[in-house]
């Protein structure tokens, strides 16, 4: 049996941009993508801590060191600049592998500075 498990998450990031007229996606600083193990164009869920909204989109790379978390396209109606969000990516795996799997969690402060090194959840 295959299970869908949390692969990684960027926890409590702060939205820095919201562009309703962009084609879609979430722009994330390349440093954070690498820290979490999220690839450009990978599907992610975005959970808005401020308003409870949840949506699925895909990650695109923002410039390294920019601390960017930009909500693009129609999803910009679901998150505003300053909102705190959680970005989650998932992976499918067999049950035996899932039992041994430790997702990566990157904790961020209100300025999108990493406050804890990536670790297993």
From Swiss-Prot:
The modification Pyruvic acid (Ser) is found at residue 25. InterPro entries: Asp_de-COase-like_dom_sf, Asp_decarbox. One of its GO terms (biological process) is alanine biosynthetic process. Keywords: Autocatalytic cleavage, Cytoplasm, Decarboxylase, Lyase, Pantothenate biosynthesis, Pyruvate, Schiff base, Zymogen. Belongs to the PanD family. It is an enzyme of class 4 (lyase). Its EC number is 4.1.1.11. This is Aspartate 1-decarboxylase. It catalyses: L-aspartate + H(+) = beta-alanine + CO2. It comes from Maricaulis maris (strain MCS10) (Caulobacter maris). The keyword Lyase applies. Gene3D superfamilies: 2.40.40.20. The keyword Cell membrane does not apply. One of its GO terms (molecular function) is aspartate 1-decarboxylase activity. Is synthesized initially as an inactive proenzyme, which is activated by self-cleavage at a specific serine bond to produce a beta-subunit with a hydroxyl group at its C-terminus and an alpha-subunit with a pyruvoyl group at its N-terminus. The active site is at 25 (schiff-base intermediate with substrate), 58 (proton donor). GO terms for cellular component: cytosol. CDD domains: Asp_decarbox. It is found in: Cytoplasm. Heterooctamer of four alpha and four beta subunits. Its cofactor is pyruvate.
């Amino acid at each position: 049996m295959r299970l869908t498990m949390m692969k990684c998450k960027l926890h409590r990031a702060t939205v820095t941009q919201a562009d309703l007229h962009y084609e879609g996606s979430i722009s994330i600083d390349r440093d954070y993508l690498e820290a979490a193990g999220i690839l450009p164009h990978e599907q992610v869920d975005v959970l808005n801590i401020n308003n409870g909204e949840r949506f699925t989109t895909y990650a695109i790379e923002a410039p390294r060191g920019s601390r960017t978390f930009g909500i693009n396209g129609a999803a910009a109606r679901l998150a505003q600049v300053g909102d705190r969000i959680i970005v989650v990516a998932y992976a499918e795996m067999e049950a035996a592998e899932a039992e041994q799997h430790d997702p990566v969690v990157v904790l961020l402060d209100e300025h999108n500075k990493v406050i804890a090194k990536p670790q297993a959840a």
